[in-house]
UniProtKB/Swiss-Prot annotation:
Its main location: other. The lineage of its organism: Eukaryota, Metazoa, Chordata, Craniata, Vertebrata. Keywords: Cell membrane, Membrane, Phosphoprotein, Synapse, Transmembrane, Transmembrane helix. Pfam families: TMEM240. It is found in: Synapse; Cell membrane. This is Transmembrane protein 240.
Length: 173
């Protein structure tokens, strides 16, 4: 599956929106809410797993207080055996960025469908012919090669300088 230019642009746009949210808002408050509210509901009280897979079985998770328990920093407490709070914050931020990116890609598709449906009703109006070319990144670099016509109906021939291989020179169009 090849990614189109629109997909890449919207993924970068989504990542920049996440960075803007992180810079403008207190991202630590959002992540602390995740750690203090959502994770305890998933783990349950006293680190009891309340998963639906074994509803009648209660699995107690006993934390291992080994060498890693010496770390006392609130920014670096250990959530599981190998994953720290900072790593979960990183994964949550990346997940949030991808969700926003894919939402923007979906909105781009919805916009294109809406524009196509709207233009289908206005087929004979030529005032919106620039919109699909603006939305299509492939067409931005290409120039339309239409023959120029004079008002009398005679064709005007435009001479272009060509490269040695026959392609038109972009400097002399």
């Amino acid at each position: 599956m090849s990614m189109s230019a629109n997909t890449m642009i919207f993924m970068i746009l989504g990542a920049s929106i996440v960075m803007a949210i992180a810079c403008l808002m207190d991202m630590n408050a959002l992540l602390d809410r995740f750690h203090n509210y959502i994770l305890p509901h998933l783990r349950g009280e006293d680190r009891v797993c309340h998963c639906n897979c074994g509803r009648h079985h209660i699995h107690y998770v006993i934390p291992y207080d080994g060498d890693q328990s010496v770390v006392d920093a609130s920014e670096n407490y250990f959530v599981t055996d190998n994953v720290t709070k900072q790593e979960i914050d990183l994964m949550l931020g990346l997940l949030l960025g991808f969700c926003i990116s894919w939402f923007l890609v979906w909105m781009d598709g919805v916009l294109h469908c809406a524009v196509r449906a709207w233009r289908a009703g206005r087929r004979y109006d030529g005032s919106w012919t620039w919109l699909p070319k603006l939305c299509s990144l492939r067409e931005l670099g290409r120039r339309p090669h239409r023959p120029f016509e004079e008002p009398t109906g005679n064709m005007v021939h435009v001479k272009q300088k060509l490269y040695h291989n026959g392609h038109p020179s972009p400097r002399h169009l």
